Amino acid sequence: GKNVINSADGNLLDGGRNPYLKSTDWGWQIDPLGLRISLNLIYDRYQIPLFISENGMGAIDQLKNNTVEDDYRIDYLKQHVKAIKQAIEEDYVDCFGYAWWGPIDIISAGTGEMKKRYGFVYVDLDDQGHGTGKRYKKKSFEVYKKIIETNGEI
């Protein structure tokens, strides 16, 4: 038989889907080990300090009682921060910063949707721009705040 490789939908670079990785609601695979490996490869090649300027996951969030219980985002964040710390402390990669993509919910550049939410702050607007525009801290807000305050402690 012929080998079939399924495409990893949504990822910036099209490639084979890893059957062992979980995916977001939009098909982006969640791969903290891949981030660590990438940091090592880039640092090994260029030998300059690295700064991660965009990392995050889009998800469908539900506002309940003026917050979002986004444990899936917290897990993603903790796994990726742990991988970065391992790259720094165990692999000696010089990575001096990490910034989440979209700290507040914004319209997705890739899909034009508001329902694809990245932020730690929920914005009460739908895909058509209807809603109050009010902002609500998600559960992940406090986790990210603590990570910043403690320089990466999780």
Each language-model region and where it sits:
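Non-catalytic scaffold segments within catalytic domains of secreted glycoside hydrolases
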Residues: 1-154
